[in-house]
Design a protein with these regions (language model features):
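Core hydrophobic alpha-helical transmembrane segments of single-pass membrane proteins
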Residues: 17-25
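Generic alpha-helix initiation/capping and coil-helix boundary signal
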Residues: 15-18, 30, 88, 442
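Intrinsically disordered, low-complexity cationic segments
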Residues: 1-3, 7, 30, 41
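Extracytoplasmic/lumenal domain signature
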Residues: 45-48, 69-89, 97-104, 110-139, ...
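N-terminal Sec-pathway targeting helices
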Residues: 3-18
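Sequence/structural signature of beta-propeller modules
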Residues: 25-73
Length: 470
């Protein structure tokens, strides 16, 4: 179990270590002063048609922009690079865009606000970097932010912050550490914001040591802890949550995926599981744990669940385990097990390499799923991308790719966006045909892509946000 919960974390460790970011020092200091506090000047709506306010667009995590009308299959081939924004650290968080402002977290420890029209930086706030002696790599901001009620919500290390959208000043901050060695506690993933609360999961740093995984619900206005849920019993470690919580507002449900556990029994509590919880109390409703026949060493769920509708008012969600099997569940009957599943790779502890953990996208009855190391028709590929009927699992199309896909998929107006290896790609949703590609200088696409208002925003581990348009 040496590599537990590392899926997302191991992938980050591998990326940053390869880039030498382990030794990166603070290069930028906020001119605002990170301990200053002020109230937001106004309350922003959840989203207008021109906003992308959450990781994968919304807290349902479908990765689809239903309001895109400019980009389409007829003009995607005409995309060109329009501008870039550089920070002193790698970018593995998805850019969030609200009211024409881009909110981008960087591994240099800063949250940046950038005007999407003028391309000028509006503010930056240094939240810091974290590291422990047992892991060789230090990190800044790894998770994607969320924007709501005039605040930017983001975690760094074991502290969760709310920043004023207009100036970046800290409105509130809350420590969520459970382990007395504070550096062992990390908020890796993106938050969900709903029901007047911010939901965020806690996991360990590099599994050295593991900690007890916890889901927190914080008051959106004050940051006070409203509720919490432990994924494994007291006395155990593991069950960390390093993906984003998914929200079903219609049923008042939070859905999370959890990591594995170290102590005997090897799968205690709700470790290595998908879990549904009440969004007010965080009391567990149901969970399903990977069965012994499908378990691998380090059997984490590293992907964020994708929520989608079904017939008869039913709601389903799909999620990848690091065994490279994609599972789909009936939300109302999770404990009964998946309604369908498909294996798309060899699986393993090394997320993004032989284990799949990219979150899927959903639109109009189709799931778009990217797997890791696989063999198709006798040929080995670093990854694959495919389309599946969301209710039956029927394969619609699938291609093997030479580069690894780390980031979650994005869709908009008939287009599918992915980053494989060092290549940003735009495909036709209907058949997977490649419409546009752009190759970066290095193996550099690890953050999810944002497609909004005719522009495509691609975060890169070469420290730049690349922006494409017609």
């Amino acid at each position: 179990m040496h590599y537990h919960i590392r899926g997302h974390k191991l992938f980050i460790i591998e990326i940053l270590w390869m880039l030498g970011i382990a030794s990166l020092s603070f290069l930028v200091v906020s001119h605002l002063g990170i301990f200053a506090a002020s109230s937001p000047s106004h309350a922003a709506p959840f989203a207008s048609s021109g906003d992308w306010p959450r990781f994968m667009y919304s807290d349902m995590h479908q990765g689809n922009n239903p309001n895109e009308t400019i980009l389409n299959t007829g003009n995607a081939s005409s995309l060109t690079l329009k501008w870039k924004f550089k920070t002193p650290g790698s970018l593995i968080a998805e850019p969030i865009i609200v009211n024409g402002i881009i909110y981008q977290g960087s591994n240099d420890g800063n949250m940046y606000a950038i005007d999407a029209t003028t391309h000028q930086q509006l503010w930056q706030t240094l939240l810091g970097r974290h590291s422990i002696s047992t892991c060789p790599v230090s990190y800044g901001i790894t998770g994607t932010a969320a924007v709501d009620i005039g605040m930017v919500f983001i975690g760094e290390g074991y502290t969760f912050y709310a920043l004023n959208t207009s100036n970046g000043q800290i409105v509130w901050q809350t420590s969520l550490a459970i382990n007395s060695n504070l550096a062992d506690n990390v908020l890796w993933g993106a938050p969900a914001v709903a029901n007047g609360k911010v939901y965020i999961g806690l996991a360990s740093d590099c599994d050295k040591p593991l900690i007890q995984g916890i889901l927190y619900a914080l008051d959106e206005n004050s940051g006070s802890i409203v509720a919490s849920a432990k994924m494994v019993p007291d006395g155990f470690v593991g069950g960390g949550i390093w993906s984003a919580p998914t929200i079903d507002a219609a049923t008042g449900t939070v859905i999370v995926s959890t990591g594995s556990v170290e102590k005997s029994p090897p799968f205690a509590g709700m470790s290595a599981s998908v879990v549904t919880l009440d969004w007010n109390t965080l009391a567990a409703k149901q969970f399903w744990q990977v069965p012994a026949s499908q378990r691998i060493k380090d059997a984490d769920w590293g992907a964020t669940p994708t929520l989608f509708p079904g017939p008869g008012g039913k709601t389903y969600f799909g999620c990848f385990n690091k065994n490279s099997t994609y599972y789909v569940f009936d939300e109302a009957n999770v404990s009964a097990g998946p309604v369908w599943q498909v294996n798309l790779g060899v699986g393993g502890a090394l997320a993004g390499i032989n284990a799949s953990f990219a979150s899927s996208a959903y639109v109009n009855g189709t799931l778009f799923i990217a797997g890791a190391l696989t063999t198709i028709n006798g040929t080995s590929y670093a990854s694959s991308i495919g389309a599946f009927d969301a209710l039956t699992g029927q394969l619609l199309w699938r291609f093997g790719l030479p580069g690894r896909i780390f980031a979650s998929l994005t869709t908009a107006n008939g287009l599918l966006f992915d980053g494989q290896g060092k290549t940003f790609e735009v495909r036709d949703q209907s058949n997977g045909n490649l419409l546009f590609s752009y190759t970066f200088p290095s193996n550099s696409i690890k953050g999810a892509i944002t497609a909004l208002n005719g522009m495509v925003y691609v975060p890169s581990v070469d420290d730049k946000l690349y922006v494409f348009g017609l």
